[in-house]
């Protein structure tokens, strides 16, 4: 007799979060434009393109940056799609391969007016084109440009470290893992785009309470993502990079016990976030208005990422809204067929990287879902 699948409950970490779902009115047009822009670089084969469209990272940007103007929504869509392509390419590489891809994308950001070499991985040209438009939206001396480049560099370095950990099967403690995850999640460069057009004073940006808000926003996003994606990552053998699995091993808990532990941890982060918002210093009426827009941007990122998790096909296929309502998940065995998007091999991905590619999919409640 086949054993019944493990069933567990997903907590609603944002049940009492003051910021509610908000979708930008510019979503349809920006999705059309950004999808066409991304596809113009031919990053995936036909199967991979289906996976890319199912994820709908344009929806993520339109939820996360929803309070902002059209230009930021479009830049946000492009940035999310760059993240996806970069992650897909580095996911099939070891540390050395990921480091080479990192060098390409960072050189493109730092030298956007330098033509990219013929035959180079397409992430370089994607980053170059994006950064010319993004940097042109603000003054050349805007602090947000420096913040973005610094944070994207930190992000790519952390992704390389994760790739090396993956190749070596490194098992980290939760605190050590969370420290890396804060960088590898890509939240900080995503938050940097929230600054564009606000001209925040450095005093406000670097204030300890503001720095804490960025870290707490990242933690809420990362922990929520780990809980929601655990079943999928477990089935794919990637649970070493998920806090649920790490807590299971650190504290000797079962899956639900580990999720409950993380729920309590996230509740503390949530309380600290609200405390920092309530006790932010004043820098005068005009600056305070811009600071509020920035804080709303961070908070909307937390809310928007959670909404996107269930509204896109990234983690739950077409059952996301059902899972969001019932909060019940089942962990079932992996199948051998992959629905994951794949980097297009010919002319884009070096053959030496392709050997690291892993095919997998799984079933939740009898339906296929896209692998992370």
UniProtKB/Swiss-Prot annotation:
A motif (DDXXD motif) lies at residues 87-91. GO terms for molecular function: metal ion binding; terpene synthase activity. It holds the Pfam family Terpene_syn_C_2. GO terms for biological process: isoprenoid biosynthetic process. Mg(2+) 1 binds at residue 87. Keywords: Lyase, Magnesium, Metal-binding. Mg(2+) 2 binds at residue 87. InterPro entries: Isoprenoid_synthase_dom_sf, Terpene_cyclase-like_2. SUPFAM superfamilies: Terpenoid synthases. Mg(2+) 3 binds at residues 225, 229, 233. Its cofactor is Mg(2+). It catalyses: (2E,6E)-farnesyl diphosphate = gamma-muurolene + diphosphate; (2E,6E)-farnesyl diphosphate = delta-cadinene + diphosphate. Its EC number is 4.2.3.-, 4.2.3.126. It is an enzyme of class 4 (lyase). (2E,6E)-farnesyl diphosphate binds at residues 314-315. It comes from the Eukaryota. The DDXXD motif is important for the catalytic activity, presumably through binding to Mg(2+). Belongs to the terpene synthase family. Terpene cyclase that catalyzes the cyclization of farnesyl diphosphate (FPP) to various sesquiterpenes, including gamma-muurolene, beta-cadinene and delta-cadinene. This is Sesquiterpene synthase Agr9.
């Amino acid at each position: 007799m086949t054993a019944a699948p493990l069933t567990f409950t997903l907590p609603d970490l944002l049940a009492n979060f003051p910021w509610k779902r908000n979708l930008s009115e510019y979503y349809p047009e920006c999705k059309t434009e950004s999808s066409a822009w991304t596809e113009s670089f031919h990053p995936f084969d036909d199967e991979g393109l289906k996976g890319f469209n199912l994820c709908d990272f344009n929806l993520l940007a339109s939820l996360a940056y929803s309070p902002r103007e059209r230009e930021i929504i479009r830049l946000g869509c492009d940035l999310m799609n760059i993240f996806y392509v970069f992650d897909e390419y580095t996911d099939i590489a070891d540390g050395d391969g990921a480091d080479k891809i990192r060098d390409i994308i960072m050189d493109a950001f730092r030298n956007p007016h330098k033509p990219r070499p013929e035959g180079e991985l397409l992430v370089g040209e994607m980053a170059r084109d994006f950064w010319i438009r993004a940097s042109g939206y603000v003054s050349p001396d805007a602090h947000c440009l420096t913040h973005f480049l610094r944070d994207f560099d930190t992000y790519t370095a952390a992704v390389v470290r994760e790739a090396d950990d993956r190749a070596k099967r490194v098992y980290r403690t939760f605190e050590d893992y969370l420290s890396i995850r804060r960088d590898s999640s890509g939240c900080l460069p995503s938050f940097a785009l929230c600054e564009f057009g606000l001209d925040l004073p450095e005093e406000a940006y670097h204030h300890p309470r503001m720095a804490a808000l960025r870290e707490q926003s990242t933690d809420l996003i990362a922990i929520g993502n780990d809980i929601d994606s655990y079943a999928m990552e477990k089935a794919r053998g990637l649970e070493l990079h998920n806090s649920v699995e790490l807590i299971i091993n650190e504290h000797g808990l079962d899956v639900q016990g580990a999720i409950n532990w993380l729920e309590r941890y996230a509740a503390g982060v949530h309380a600290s976030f609200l405390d920092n918002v309530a006790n932010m210093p004043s820098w005068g009426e005009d600056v305070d208005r811009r600071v509020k827009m920035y804080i709303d941007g961070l908070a909307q990122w937390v809310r928007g990422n959670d909404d996107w998790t269930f509204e896109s096909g990234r983690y739950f296929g077409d059952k996301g809204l059902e899972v969001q309502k019932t909060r019940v998940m089942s962990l079932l065995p992996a199948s051998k067929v992959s629905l994951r998007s794949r980097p297009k091999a010919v002319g884009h991905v070096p053959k030496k990287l392709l050997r690291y590619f892993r095919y997998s999919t799984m079933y939740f409640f009898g339906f296929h879902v896209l692998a992370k």
